Every structure is written in C-alpha cells, then in structure tokens.
C-alpha cells in the first residue's frame, strides 16, 4: 500500500491562529482519502470488499459513488444493491444526482436497486430484487449505516425472534463464498453498537468464516475481562488485514467543541419511596421470567427495568384517591402488550400488527391521559397557593441566577425559601428540575432529550416548562426566549419539518424565536440543528452509541459557523438519579453497563484503526497524541522468503507475526538521510534516490513514508557496499509488487 499509493498520503493539517475554516469556500471535488478507496478497490484489485470506517463529515456516500463510477468505467455490467434505512434514501438520491451527469443518470439507475433494511418486508424486497436482476452481471452490495443492519442480524440470532436481517445476511455471505468476484462495501462511523461480536459478524460477511459463528466461542477466544484479549489481538488483526479503511472525519476545526457535564442528582425521599416500590415489583417479575424460553425472554429484554427507569425520571405525586405514584397504570393490568406500550411511550406510534385488545389499549391510554390531566390540576393548586403567599418559581429562578450564579447544587442545598411548587416538582423529579434550571445559563438554543415521549419523558418536561413560562411555538404568540418545539415520532412529518425550519433560522441564533427543541430517538434520525449551545440528556441508555448520535445532531460540520469562534462550543449535560442512601439506582446501573460496553468495544475499534490499509497514509489527520500505532509486520520477517498467509487459521497461530504479537518489541533506531541505488543485477543499478538508513542493520527506508525498502550489505570489515562516494548500494530489495494504471476518478 505504501509503495503503490503514496500519492494519497495526507499532509499535516495547517492551523492558522484566528483563521475560520468554516468561512473557506470549497469546490465540489473528491478528497485524496476518497479517491484512495477507488484506487485500492478498482476493477483489477485483488481486494473486492471493505469496511469503510469513516467518521462524521467525511463524505462516505460520495466515496462510494466514486467507486461505483470507477467500476462502471471498466465495465457497465453490474448489479448494484444499496441497502439503507428508509429515512436516508432521499440523501442518497441527492448525492447520486450530484456525482452523476444528467445524460448518464437514467441509464445508470437501471442497475441500482435500493432495499430498506428497516422495512418489515426487507427480506422479501431483497430477494425480489435479486430475482429481477441480471444474473450474467457481477453483483455489488453496499450497506450504509451497516452497524444498524448488523445489530438487527445479531438480534435475529440471539433472540430467535424475527429473521428479516439474517435472511439478507446469509444470502450475501453464501454468494461471497461461492463467487469471490462479489463485491461488498460496508459504510459506518460506528462499527458496533452493543457487542464486539457485531464486529465479527461484519467481517464474516466480508471474508466468510474467519471468526466463529458462535458468540460464546468468539468471546472465549478474543475477550479477556473487559477488553480484547492481548494474546489474540495480533491474530484478530491478521484475519482482517486488507478489509478496513479508516478516516476520522472532517477537520475537527469545522466542529464546535464538546464540553461534557455529568450531573448526579439525589432523589427526594418521596421519589425514592415510589422508585423502591417498583424495584420490588421488577425483582418479582425477574424471578418469574428466568425460566421462560429464550424467544420470550428476548421480548422481555426490550422492556427490562422499564418501571425503575421511568421512576428515575419522574414519579407521580399523591393526587387523591387511587391516583398515586405507586398506582401509575401498567399495561399488564389492561391486558395490553408491554412492548407495544413501550413504543408508544417512546414516541413511536407504529404498533405491531399483532397488537390485540384494542378496547383495552384505548382504556389504558385514557387512564394515562387522566393521570396527566390530574397532574396539571395538582400543580395548579400548589401554584395558586404560592401566588397568595407571594412565592413563585420565577422568583426561585431569579435567586438561582443572581445569588447562586447558576450553580444548581449549591442553590438547592442552601436556598431555604423555595416555592412550594418547586419543592413539589423536585419531589417528583430531581432530574427534570436540575435540567430546567441548568438550561437558564444557556446563551443559545437548547436540546432537551429523553428516550420517553409520553408520561415520564417529554410530556412531563413540557408540563414543567409551562410553569417556568415556556409555551409551544407558533409565529404569533409567546414570549421571546421562552418558546419550545417538538421533534419526534408522535409529531407529524409536516410539523417536524416546520419546527426544524424555524428552529434553524438565522434569527434564532440566540434562541430568541425558539429556545428549546424537545427530541427523542424515534423519528429524529438525520436531523441537523444549528447553533445549539446546550444538550440535556435526561436519562442514560444501554449503549453510548445512541447518546453519541444525539450529540452528533447538535454538533455538525460548521453548524456553529454563524457564531464567533470563541463561542463555538456545546455544553452536554447527562443526568443520573441517585438514592439518598447511595444504593445503586437503575440510572447508575445502566450508565455503568454502557461505560463497560464502550470500553470493550473501544478496545476492538482501536485495532481496526491500527490495521486499516490506509493507516500510514492518513495518520496526519487521524492520530493525535500517539493514541495508537499502525500495524506492521516484524521487520526481520520482511527479508525472509515468506511471512505466511495473513489470515489462515493455522498460520496465524504458528506465525504470530505483527506489531501486536506478544513476542514483538518496539525499539527506536537512529537513521541518517543517504543517497542509494537498487542493485538490478548484471552490474546495473536504478537511479539515485534519497532514503533513510539505519547504519547498525543496513536497512534502508522510504524517505516519505518510512517503510523498509531493502538492505545495504557490509563486508567483513564492516564497510558498506557503495557505488561511488556517498552513494550506497541496496543489495537486497524487499519484493513489493507494484501496481500499474491505477484509476481514481
């Protein structure tokens, strides 16, 4: 790679003090790292598959379309299957129109088939597309956001429920086994969501059979403690050699800085009491479900700890009669599917076709509405009493701003003369109170995020905001800096589009028009928001990927370009509820599990970066603070006849050769710049070039990319072989194959 593709080496990023990179006008053209993909995977390349592990703003789609163009220029006989989520099809169509000329667009689109892998008919649509394709043509499969597809495959395998993703996966894997000309390109900035075995599934699609099909066997071999087993780290890398391209993403200067603030808030005794009531119920349910079949257990997992997760966010007060926190309506009492109700609570209004008991479902939703109605009546009564006693939440906020300088913990601990409404708010939800108070320090637009839309999520946040003076946005009413909009699955697409449009207008740079946007995961994929100054994450999630995706919606490439450079930062608050006795809560448990997953997956992602075919080419942009080193074979082995197959199972055990081998040592050497020629035989030599040379070993290195070229021999007296004064002879040259006629665009 280094010999044949050195023209794609990226220079160091040049940063000029005070220069604003977002003000630079750039031409619509491919970058070097994008052109490299097409050169490495061109028609004559021995490599026909790759994981494109490229970060935010890198232009993965454009890189892929360019590869499609290169292959098409060699031969038009291709079946191209693009597997994506339905929500990003529009983006793909826009990119294809950008990178294809009008005169060839119609003809090229004849051989391109889109399959939405998140469709309930994904497997059928895929197999139909295969049947309708021309079997005489070569096939190319392209997956965008492949981590989502592989996560679906993993869920199909482990839960034994559903098979749509696995049908597609198995078909392509079998075709790859039968026909090595089949091309596969996987695109992602996040190779794994929950489990390193997802990475194994990914590479088994590219190079079938290199990793165990069993998660248990994979874990035994490659995981030790909470990290990749160092004993088998080198073996793992050798198995995937040639399969990864890594680029960290667009220049970091184009993105706002991210400042993270973990916020742990202590529950009021009342909230803790209700929380522990539901904790007892969950423990009983857990005991009952331990012996259930695996398939049913999979359904249970989707709602695991949902009672206490919700109680960490909010618990209903005692509103009179049976309307209490402990009696909060649960699906089981209405013979309604827990998983369906979970979808409704999370803002996904598309219920499974299998949902039964429609009347019971309506009754359940009516009781939920009653709870929310009575909650407002309850808070109104307390607010009215406060007004009579010359107290109010607005006065609490003024004290918080001016006396305590936006320090919520100090304010809550020291300020004694709080309004009764604020005390009641806190007794139900310590986190929502902390979140709203912290938001008052923001000098610009704000995201407030919850997994839940109904009840213990955005619905309660809206009610709290009402008492702080906030109103839903419309173009006529409301007070400047005190309006909010919503963007989630319970809002129509028309309203979502409108809300985003007004939230992102230039006049809203400080949040004057709309201060807060309330979002949840459902229905908010791909949203880009401008000039966000704060992100508030109400609860942790089982993996960090979801939270990172949320932050990615707030911090886009040049999304803060309208702000002065010293104001281009985003404060990200992540809330955790804790008990007064410090016994672990579900919030703390979930965050701990997510951190462990992140650490484990991170140990695998590092070795993907190290083994990337373009690691040395792109390291000036990718590697900061020596966080990892590019994979290399042991230097001495390069002068042997063979270093063995890189990924054969037997050979990787016998020939444990590579940077991460437990027997490898990294040593520093002193080199000097010299002139040298290569010995071509019969007293003929190449032209003189400059190299680096290690006088101790005689090894000569490429002066630009520093990879070994060959070796200068020394005679018995230790005198090196020279052609003439100052020009050394490279007597032994490492036989690196050279590629000719590379095409890149």
Which residue ranges define each predicted feature?
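Conserved SF2 helicase motif VI
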Residues: 543-563
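Short conserved active-site loop signatures built around small residues
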Residues: 535
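The feature captures the C-terminal accessory region of ATP-dependent helicases
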Residues: 626-745
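Short glycine-rich donor-binding/catalytic loop of glycosyltransferases
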Residues: 522, 540, 562
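Conserved AAA+/SF3 P-loop NTPase catalytic/coupling segment centered on the Walker-B
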Residues: 196-199, 541-547
């Amino acid at each position: 790679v280094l010999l044949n593709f050195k023209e794609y080496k990226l220079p160091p990023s040049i940063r000029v003090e005070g220069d604003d990179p977002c003000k630079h006008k750039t031409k619509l053209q491919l970058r070097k790292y994008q052109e490299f993909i097409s050169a490495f995977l061109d028609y004559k390349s021995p490599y026909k598959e790759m994981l494109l592990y490229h970060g935010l703003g890198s232009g993965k789609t454009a890189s892929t379309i360019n590869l499609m163009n290169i292959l098409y220029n060699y031969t038009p006989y291709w079946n191209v299957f693009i597997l994506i989520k339905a929500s990003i099809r529009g983006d793909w169509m826009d990119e294809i129109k950008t990178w294809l000329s009008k005169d060839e667009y119609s003809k090229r689109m004849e051989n391109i088939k889109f399959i939405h892998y998140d469709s309930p008919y994904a497997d059928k649509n895929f197999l139909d597309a295969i049947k309708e394709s021309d079997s005489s043509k070569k096939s190319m499969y392209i997956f965008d956001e492949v981590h989502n597809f592989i996560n679906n495959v993993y869920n199909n395998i482990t839960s034994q429920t559903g098979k749509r993703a696995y049908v597609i996966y198995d078909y392509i894997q079998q075709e790859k086994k039968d026909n090595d000309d089949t091309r596969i390109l996987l695109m992602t900035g996040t190779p794994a969501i929950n489990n390193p075995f997802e990475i194994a599934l990914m590479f088994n699609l590219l190079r079938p059979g290199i990793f165990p099909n069993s998660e248990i066997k994979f874990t035994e071999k490659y995981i030790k403690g909470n990290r990749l087993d160092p004993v088998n780290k080198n073996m793992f890398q050798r198995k995937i050699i040639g399969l990864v391209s890594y680029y960290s993403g667009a220049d970091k200067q184009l993105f706002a800085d991210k400042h993270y603030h973990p916020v742990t808030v202590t529950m009021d005794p009342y909230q803790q009491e209700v929380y522990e009531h539901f904790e007892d119920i969950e423990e009983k349910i857990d005991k009952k479900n331990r012996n259930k079949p695996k398939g049913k257990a999979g359904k249970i997992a989707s709602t695991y700890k949902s009672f206490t997760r919700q109680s960490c966010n909010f618990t209903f007060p005692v509103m009179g009669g049976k309307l209490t926190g402990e009696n909060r309506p649960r699906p089981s009492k209405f013979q309604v599917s827990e998983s369906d109700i979970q979808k409704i609570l999370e803002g996904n209004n598309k219920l499974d076709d299998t949902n039964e008991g429609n009347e019971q479902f309506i009754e359940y939703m009516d009781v939920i509405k009653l709870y929310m109605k009575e909650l407002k009546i309850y808070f109104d009564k307390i607010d009215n009493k406060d007004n009579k006693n010359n107290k109010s939440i607005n006065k609490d906020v003024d004290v918080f701003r001016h006396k305590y300088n936006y320090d919520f913990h100090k304010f809550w601990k020291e300020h004694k003369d709080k309004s009764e409404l604020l005390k009641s708010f806190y007794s139900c939800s310590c986190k929502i109170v902390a979140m709203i108070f912290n938001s008052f320090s923001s000098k610009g637009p704000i995201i407030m995020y919850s997994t839940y839309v109904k009840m213990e999520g955005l619905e309660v946040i809206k009610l709290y905001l009402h008492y702080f003076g906030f109103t839903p946005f419309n173009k006529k009413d409301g007070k400047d800096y005190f309006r909010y909009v919503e963007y989630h699955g319970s809002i129509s697409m028309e309203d979502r589009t409108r809300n985003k449009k007004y939230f992102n207008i230039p006049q809203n740079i400080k949040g004057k028009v709309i201060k807060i946007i309330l979002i949840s995961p459902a229905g908010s994929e791909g949203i880009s928001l401008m000039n966000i100054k704060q992100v508030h994450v109400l609860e942790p999630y089982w993996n960090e990927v979801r939270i990172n995706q949320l932050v990615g919606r707030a911090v886009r490439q040049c999304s803060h370009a309208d702000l002065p450079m010293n104001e281009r930062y985003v404060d990200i608050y992540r809330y955790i509820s804790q008990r007064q006795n410090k016994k672990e809560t579900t919030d703390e448990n979930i965050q701990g599990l997510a951190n462990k997953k992140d650490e484990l997956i991170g140990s695998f992602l590092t070795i993907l970066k190290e083994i990337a075919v373009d690691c040395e080419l792109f390291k000036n942009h990718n590697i900061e603070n020596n966080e990892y080193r590019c994979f290399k074979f042991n230097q001495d082995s390069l002068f042997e006849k063979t270093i063995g197959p890189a990924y054969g199972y037997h050979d990787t055990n016998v020939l444990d050769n590579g940077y991460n081998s437990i027997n490898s040592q990294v040593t520093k050497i002193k080199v000097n710049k010299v002139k040298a020629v290569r010995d071509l035989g019969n007293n003929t030599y190449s032209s003189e070039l400059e190299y680096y040379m290690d006088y101790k070993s005689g090894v000569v290195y490429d002066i630009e990319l520093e990879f070994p070229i060959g070796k200068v021999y020394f005679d018995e007296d230790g005198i090196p072989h020279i052609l003439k004064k100052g020009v050394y002879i490279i007597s032994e040259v490492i036989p690196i194959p050279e590629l000719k006629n590379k095409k890149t665009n």
